[in-house]
Amino acid sequence: MALRERIRIRLKAYDHRILDQSTTEIVDTAKRTGATVAGPIPLPTSRSITTVLRSPHVDKKSREQFEIRTHKRLLDILEPTQQTVDALMKLDLPAGVDVEIKAFGK
């Protein structure tokens, strides 16, 4: 009997390689414990641009732009077992990955 109907996991990171590595680790763990996985679904990458002056005093026209991209992935774990939940709790992911977990029941 399933503990919950569905677990939704959203992953965010600045580096897409670490994000994909974490995603495959979660998918492998869920499949190994007998759960069905939908995804990973790549969500749109958000891009933030910051413009600063190059000089502290003069040259207002001389500016520099910095960009940071936030990559996102979505995973749905359908019909998770108790083993799946325990394995996901013990999973050690890299420090640069933000994980949001939501559980949906009946």
From Swiss-Prot:
Q: Which GO terms describe its biological process?
A: translation
Q: Which SUPFAM superfamilies match?
A: Ribosomal protein S10 (SSF54999)
Q: Name one GO cellular component term.
A: ribosome
The answer, when asked if Ribosomal protein is one of the entry's keywords, is yes
What GO MF annotations does this protein's record show? structural constituent of ribosome; tRNA binding
The family database entries (InterPro entries) matched by this protein are listed as: Ribosomal_uS10 (IPR001848), Ribosomal_uS10_CS (IPR018268), Ribosomal_uS10_dom (IPR027486), Ribosomal_uS10_dom_sf (IPR036838)
- Which PROSITE patterns does the record associate with it? RIBOSOMAL_S10
Mind listing the UniProt keywords for this protein, alphabetically? Answer: Ribonucleoprotein, Ribosomal protein
What is the annotated quaternary arrangement, including any partners?
Part of the 30S ribosomal subunit.
Q: What family does the entry list? A: Belongs to the universal ribosomal protein uS10 family.
What is the stated purpose of this protein? Involved in the binding of tRNA to the ribosomes.
Q: What is this protein called?
A: Small ribosomal subunit protein uS10
Which species?
Solibacter usitatus (strain Ellin6076)
Read off the lineage from the record.
Answer: Bacteria, Pseudomonadati, Acidobacteriota, Terriglobia, Bryobacterales
